[in-house]
Amino acid sequence: GPQRIGQDVVIIGGGAVGCAVARELSRWQLDVCLVEQGEDVCVGTSKANSAIVHAGFDAPAGSLKARFNVEGSRRMEALSRELDFPYRRNGALVLCFEEAGLPHLEELLHRGQVNGVEGLEIVRGEQLRALEPALSEKAIAALYAPSSAIICPFGMTIALAENAAHNGVTFRFDTRVERIRRTQAGY
């Protein structure tokens, strides 16, 4: 028959978001269980993550996504040190190959500034080539976002899960959630 789980909080999914939620909730006096249909954490969508820590210049101005991009970018390096997973602030270049594309770079620059992204600038010529020497000669300009970074999605998700488990979160793997039913005691 169906298994019943009697915790204060049940998190469905052991990807990056589920493990981050588990880790955060593990700081509180709660009985937390993370349920994952796979055999381990980070076996679904998170394993195919691009690994980019977005600076926040491309999210719609003032949006929740922009806020989370900027705040996440600012906090990720400290989190990587705390939990010991790979992080590299290598910056990002949004390339422009023709004059007609320059207004788009200006738009991204403005959007990023509205969103609170620090250090954005449009670079050209020698400054652009100094940032990326192997760049195509056809590139005429770029938006440079020095706060963009990359992480190891596996390393981060595993580190979050390990910390959550150390703090008392229970993990149930190979467990599929088929139904959630409301009861007098909750769900």
Whereabouts are the PLM-identified features?
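Gly/Ala-rich phosphate-binding loop of Rossmann-like dinucleotide-binding domains
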Residues: A22, S26, N163
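Dinucleotide-binding Rossmann-like beta1-alpha1 core, especially the glycine-rich loop
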Residues: A51-L131, I140
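Helical element adjacent to the flavin cofactor pocket in flavoenzyme catalytic cores
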Residues: L143-Y187
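Beta1/beta-strand and adjacent pyrophosphate-binding region of the FAD-binding site
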Residues: P2-V17, C33
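Short phosphate-binding/catalytic loops that engage adenosine nucleotides
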Residues: L30, V117, V169
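Short, flexible, mixed-charge acidic loops at enzyme active sites
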Residues: G44-A51, L135
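Glycine-rich FAD pyrophosphate-binding loop
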Residues: S26-K47
